């Protein structure tokens, strides 16, 4: 996203507006000038993609989570060592104005995912990688950042606006690190390139907006938003502007270098300033550019999206709640204390999930976990709290039915419009006087054990609650995800006994970075890749349910590196298929073997794979009852 063609133009045609800079020197100068600790605001998702590609991690395995977390901790420490305080801000929602762009990207990315699975048929080695990021890491990275000792926040509107505004309003911020050409347009602190960032020297390129405007465009900095709206951005689409831009070109190729001089002269001749308070100017621009005044509102919206002196109002919770609840929803979202889905659900009645690494061999994960989400919706919106019932569910503030717009990227879903999903009731809930608790009571009044009981009811898994309640916090998400895959989602298991055993065993390894790095790159097959995706989508769903229930366990225990490593899982699964042995899975360590039997008993309890009933000796040759 950003301004169409601007990065290429500035790098190829504006040498003085692209300066190599040292972040350490910039920070020192800022501290000397303002006597504050210098802060660098980092576009979180942008950083995540760049840093993940930096390492040796292979995303198709499902994520080498511990290695990624340690790498992130290393770079955060390095920032602090040069006197810079990094603050990460992540996309916390998809704005309505960007939904079409989001959908188009998801469709393109899902086509790429299917190509990856085609590659698996030709090459089963780990080197055949997607070049992307592991499933769900975009939803979880802000929590990894927080545990690594840095500040992390989630936006409640378009992240580039939030980042630009935060930087402009805080004197201690000296720069923004990202790769989005919109930051050249915003009148905020200096914009540093993530693409050119050197992870060793901490040097990069500064895109100088003042130099670009005055020296190369011959416009004022304040006119850059208008320039953006006339060359194409996320609101005023390039496709709409193409006929106008073509009329300014010397050739039939609509490249910025071919029309930029004529465009800037045109702006000056018309005396356009981009003043959003002048509706007359908006109409004049629309008439000249599009041939009618019909697009004046679009120009106005495009310009307003860069106006940092405007506050974008935060959406309110869609049902009637107390001011305390309203405030808590926004604070938990901003401070990364809830799953990011909660804000979108409560305030916009939307659920968004990007493409994941899966093929067409089974139902898409988005559909498999949908009923669990639907039960979350029922709890979040008080749909079935008396006097409401299944026959008479709760409504929004305005009296509308609770219907969630689900935007989930999977094969066969064109996302021309959302899927409309209704809440589902809970079965046999026995806490809080035999009724479904109000969402405010669930968050603020119930004990952790009572919250965990609601969590268990939402999942509808075979595992007995008492066994769940006795688990260490680090094993709750793992155990519940596996129990769902065995008997909570479909009538027949979605996971084989040997695969269950491998998931349990790898969770119990005392993982060390060096040992994980030294593991040989495993052979890959589509089934194992699909399985890891299914598991990680389950982890993400557990996060949603736990946040729905007021976080009965601390967020940090939900993070995958506590119980999962993708490379280790593939390595152990390959070994187990050749030599299925408990002792081999557990590194021949008696203490690990003992923990394995204990955790496996919990995971499979009351299911078709229950260790007291299923012939596990046929699965693992040295299995002992």
Roles of regions detected by a PLM:
Residues 64-65, 130, 151-155:
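Short, flexible loop segments at the rims of nucleotide/cofactor-binding pockets, characterized by
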Residues 166-194:
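Acidic, metal-binding active-site segment of PIN/NYN-like and related structure-specific nucleases
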Residues 85-86, 152, 174:
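Hydrophobic anchor at the start of a short beta-strand
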Residues 131-137, 156-164:
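Active-site neighborhood for divalent-cation/phosphate handling
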Residues 90-92, 151-162:
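Acidic carboxylate-rich catalytic motifs and surrounding loops in phosphoryl-/glycosyl-chemistry enzymes
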Residues 1-81, 85-90, 94-126, 140-144, ...:
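Charged, low-complexity intrinsically disordered segments
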């Amino acid at each position: 996203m950003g301004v169409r063609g601007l990065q290429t133009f500035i790098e190829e045609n504006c040498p003085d507006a692209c300066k190599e800079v040292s972040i350490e020197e910039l920070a020192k100068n800022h501290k000397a000038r303002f006597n504050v600790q210098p802060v660098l605001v980092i576009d979180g998702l942008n950083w995540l993609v760049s840093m993940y590609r930096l390492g040796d991690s292979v995303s198709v395995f499902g994520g080498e989570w511990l290695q990624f977390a340690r790498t992130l901790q290393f770079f955060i420490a390095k920032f602090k060592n040069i006197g810079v305080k990094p603050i990460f801000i992540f996309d916390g929602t998809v704005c309505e104005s960007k939904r079409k762009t989001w959908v188009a990207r998801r469709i393109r990315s899902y086509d790429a995912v299917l190509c990856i699975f085609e590659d698996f048929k030709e090459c089963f080695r780990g080197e055949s990688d997607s070049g992307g990021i592991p499933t769900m890491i975009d939803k979880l990275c802000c929590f990894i950042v927080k545990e690594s000792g840095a500040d992390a926040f989630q936006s409640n509107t378009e992240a580039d606006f939030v980042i630009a505004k935060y930087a402009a309003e805080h004197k201690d911020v000296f720069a923004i690190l990202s790769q989005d050409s919109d930051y050249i347009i915003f009148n905020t602190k200096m914009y540093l390139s993530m693409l050119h960032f050197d992870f060793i020297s901490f040097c990069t390129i500064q895109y100088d907006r003042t130099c670009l405007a005055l020296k190369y465009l011959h416009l004022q900095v304040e006119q850059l938003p208008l320039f953006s709206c006339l060359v194409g951005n996320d609101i005023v689409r390039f496709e709409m502007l193409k006929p106008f831009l073509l009329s300014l070109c010397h050739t039939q190729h609509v490249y910025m270098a071919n029309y930029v001089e004529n465009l800037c002269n045109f702006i000056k001749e018309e005396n356009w300033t981009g003043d959003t308070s002048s509706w007359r100017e908006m109409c004049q621009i629309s008439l000249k550019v599009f041939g009618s005044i019909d697009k004046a509102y679009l120009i106005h919206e495009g310009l307003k999206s860069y106006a940092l002196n405007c506050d974008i109002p935060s959406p309110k919770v869609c049902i009637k709640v107390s001011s305390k609840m309203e405030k808590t929803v926004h604070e938990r979202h901003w401070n990364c204390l809830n799953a990011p889905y909660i804000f979108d659900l409560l305030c916009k009645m939307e659920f968004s999930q990007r493409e994941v690494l899966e093929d067409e061999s089974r139902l898409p994960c988005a559909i498999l976990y949908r009923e669990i989400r639907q039960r979350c919706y029922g709890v979040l919106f008080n749909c079935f709290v008396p006097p409401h019932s299944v026959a008479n569910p709760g409504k929004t503030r305005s009296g509308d039915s609770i219907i969630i717009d689900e935007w989930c990227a999977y094969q066969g879903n064109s996302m021309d419009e959302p899927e409309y999903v209704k809440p589902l009731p809970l079965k046999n809930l026995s806490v809080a006087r035999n009724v479904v608790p109000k969402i405010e009571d669930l968050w603020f009044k119930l004990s952790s054990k009572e919250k965990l009981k609601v969590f268990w009811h939402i999942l509808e898994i075979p595992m007995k609650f008492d066994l769940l309640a006795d688990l260490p916090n680090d094993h709750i998400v793992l155990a519940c995800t596996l129990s769902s895959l065995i008997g909570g989602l479909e009538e027949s298991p979605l996971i084989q006994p040997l695969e269950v055993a491998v998931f349990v065993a790898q969770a119990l390894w005392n993982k060390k970075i060096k040992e994980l790095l030294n593991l040989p790159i495993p052979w890959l097959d589509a089934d194992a890749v699909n399985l890891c995706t299914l598991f990680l989508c389950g982890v993400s769903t557990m996060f949603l349910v736990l946040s729905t229930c007021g976080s009965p366990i601390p967020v940090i225990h939900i993070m995958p590196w506590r119980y999962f490593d993708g490379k280790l899982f593939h390595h152990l699964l390959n070994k187990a298929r050749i030599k299925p042995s408990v002792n081999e899975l557990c590194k021949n360590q008696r203490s690990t073997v003992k923990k394995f039997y204990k955790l496996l008993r919990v995971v499979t309890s009351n299911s078709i794979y229950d260790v007291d009933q299923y012939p596990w000796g046929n699965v693992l040759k040295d299995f002992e009852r």
